[in-house]
Amino acid sequence: MLQALLDSKDFLALTLANPETLGDEFSFTLGEHTRVEVWNTGVIVFEPAQAQGKDVILSCGVHGNETAPIELCNTLIKQLLQQKIIAKQRTLFLIGNPLAINNGTRIIDENMNRLFSGEHSNPPGLVNPERVRAKKLEAYVDRFFKGAAAGRQRIHYDLHTAMRASKHEKFAIYPYRPGRAYSAEQIMFLAASGVDTVLFHHEPTTTFSYFSSEQYGADAFTIELGKVYPMGQNDMTRFIAAQEMFMRLITDKPLALEPFSADKVNLYQVCRVINKHFDDFEFTFAADVENFRSFPKGFVLAREGGQEIKVEQEFEAIVFPNAKVPIGNRTVICLIPSVAPDVR
């Protein structure tokens, strides 16, 4: 395994050729500046000899068909392995769901991004590949963040692409963080990365980014970088800004961020989540409606069990509508413009 990686510098290829395990961990050094550790398939750590003050996690492929972030991360990994760039911050890359990537599908059995914060082990337990992998990913995050002295800034960007078109092509979900202000620096970092829209979540969830935020105090985000396309069919020029900013972060180059200003970004507050309670749940709008489409108060969004679900606020925008989820799961997130969020 070691020699294959040293020869190819292609960690994604190694991961997809061994989607369940790489066997024993292995490590090696790049020059005299970086120790590289491979903990398992899809799990690679870059430990600078003289690390600066940030611990950075870039995760991708939690959903197997969201390929642009996978290609983006593999490019950064390849540049690090080729020593075209040199890590100055401790950095962990996670390729989340290799089995689903090989399968060309979003999932194998279950949506992995609903299985963190221990949800993987709640009934029915570790019964499928996503649940088993989610538990392992939590352990890798724990090991990484606890592998350095306390007091360092912890960052986790969980990278995705969306299944549908969007009014705002790139957007981020800021996990619920009661008692903690939102980071102005992080919001402007996202903006510099081309991610000009942020959704503030209103309650705990079982997503990967919420896990890192809540358990480790990380500046963590679920970041949607565009639309789903098959591997190799992404227009990677659309991700130049994101790749550049991630590279600058990892290599400790100046970020040159603008001061925070609410008029430079689109800020939304999650006002509610609509879950599915009956098999006959259906939306009233077209199946191809774009993310952030707005509807007026009183508009019937959906019907189920003989009841109508209406827009409650003056206007509500929607993201991630999906009527085909299992009963009990989220069908859509409803948003309102965010007014004076606590950003510092």
UniProtKB/Swiss-Prot annotation:
GO-annotated biological processes: arginine catabolic process to glutamate; arginine catabolic process to succinate
Pathway membership: Amino-acid degradation; L-arginine degradation via AST pathway; L-glutamate and succinate from L-arginine: step 5/5
E.C. designation(s): 3.5.1.96
Domain of life: Bacteria
Cofactor binding comment, as recorded: Binds 1 zinc ion per subunit.
Pfam families: AstE_AspA_cat, AstE_AspA_hybrid
Binding positions for Zn(2+) per the UniProt entry: H63, E66, H160
Catalysed reaction equations from the record: N-succinyl-L-glutamate + H2O = L-glutamate + succinate
GO molecular function terms noted in the UniProt entry: hydrolase activity, acting on ester bonds; succinylglutamate desuccinylase activity; zinc ion binding
Active site (record annotation): E224
Record-stated family: Belongs to the AspA/AstE family. Succinylglutamate desuccinylase subfamily.
UniProt-recorded name of the protein: Succinylglutamate desuccinylase
Organism this protein belongs to: Shewanella sp. (strain ANA-3)
Taxonomic lineage: Bacteria, Pseudomonadati, Pseudomonadota, Gammaproteobacteria, Alteromonadales
